[in-house]
């Protein structure tokens, strides 16, 4: 994302132009002073960048289908496969494109008319996009817009880089309600929780706006992964047979719905809360309904929700892979479909799996921790995905991918979900934008019906010495979510903390397998500068890691193993540390000599000569920024001492 973080806000604050590398949370920080916010709100908003949010149509907990990237996008600046730069919001760029790409525009218009003429297809598109759906390419623009440039811009949403490079977007901002309240509602069954969500979805105020702005479902496994205190209480009561109607020892029914309402005034907020509480009287909750409008309280609820994926992933067995999928059902099907989904996952033996997500939109994520080490495990996963396809598509006509891009895992099922006519239209769009099929191949469109059960990425355990094993076990919990990268000082310069773990896993895999010693040696050599030497080692990465993994600790281990006690490098460093004054005095003439050489030879010649010596002998590389030698005078030392004394006096 570095160097792609420019932005501009319109004079009325209702539009913002963004480059793709800026993080979603940063956009919210920029808009907050004006009472506005970035409409898409995925749980990963503190780490996800605008480009990824748009190209995956990652929506989130509140924006639903009414304020996702597709609905708030105004224009896009893209670079096509042939190198053409098109800014759909710039009249000059549009006019130029109409001349240079006449056939391209004509084909977009033909596809638009073909889809609209096929009334059955057009109606299916409207129906499919009435809920969250990112399976395949985005066909909705063909029925929403007449202007071919509007269609082109909106085709980018959810396209996962398969059509063009997105270099800039202009989007509508959203009003940020100043008054908010949330409640964590607990139900004894997932079906009862779903019925309550369906009822709350129907609540609207006098202006026609939804009273409930968000309803996030968390099943029992989600609650267990974060040690939710209410879940622990429920578990204890169930274990002691203290709950009538609940099978002793069966805590799998407890389901939470994190509910949020927002308003323009305190009075309006209270009206909303009263309306929701009245609605919920028709349902039995495990504990009484209690809303809070205190940010310090409800922010904890939402922090729990945002951390579910990495927290559940962190409980996986070492060596297994944490997989997440997101599906969507129509709201009227929610109670039955949700219960069947839970039963289906359990039937396949995924006892540590969890279901959670945006219940108000009928959109759920489910997480499984999967081993691919045996053919039996691969077959189990294949059977699960086939049954998911049958449940979601064949029975409920829902979405196999709701908000995070199709990906390779769902690519084999795109045609099955959409049907031949829609799939043919998607293929025509792909062929128009990328006739050679070079952009992100195999994603969205894949001719291999088994591509989702091939080429699995291994997650080998890190190999460390016995004394360092505790730290490596912590790092083994990494699910490579990337939440750490926002705090990593070297991210964008060399490697991020996540990438360091990824590379160390590959190094460990090669060590364990012994399959390619040459590649192992090359990786270890190439890792030294970007992986080891440029890591700050300060542990800031752990502050945004849900598992608290400190990649700096891993770097310290690598450094210690590279320079063990008794080695020449360790002895040299130890000597310098204990004789710094003498070493400093000895190095002063070296700096003077380097400065003399620079003044005599000039920058160009000095750089060339020292670079040659560096390559031949390994001496430190000279740069024009290298300082001259300097020795503090007695008066300067006295002044420094006086300043330190005064500072100490002020502190006292």
Feature names for model-found ranges:
Residues 1-42, 58-110, 177-188, 323-332, ...:
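N-terminal glycine-rich flavin-associated loop
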Residues 53-62, 149-174, 357-363, 400-401, ...:
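Conserved phosphate/anionic-ligand binding catalytic regions in large, soluble enzymes, centered on
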Residues 98-143, 433-486, 492-509, 604-642:
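Flexible inter-domain linker/hinge segments
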Residues 393-400, 405-535, 544-568, 574-579, ...:
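Ferredoxin-type iron-sulfur electron-transfer modules and their immediate structural context
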Residues 314-318, 514-652:
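Iron-sulfur-cluster electron-transfer modules
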Residues 143-149, 153-383, 391, 396-399, ...:
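C-terminal substrate-recognition/cap domain of FAD-linked oxidoreductases
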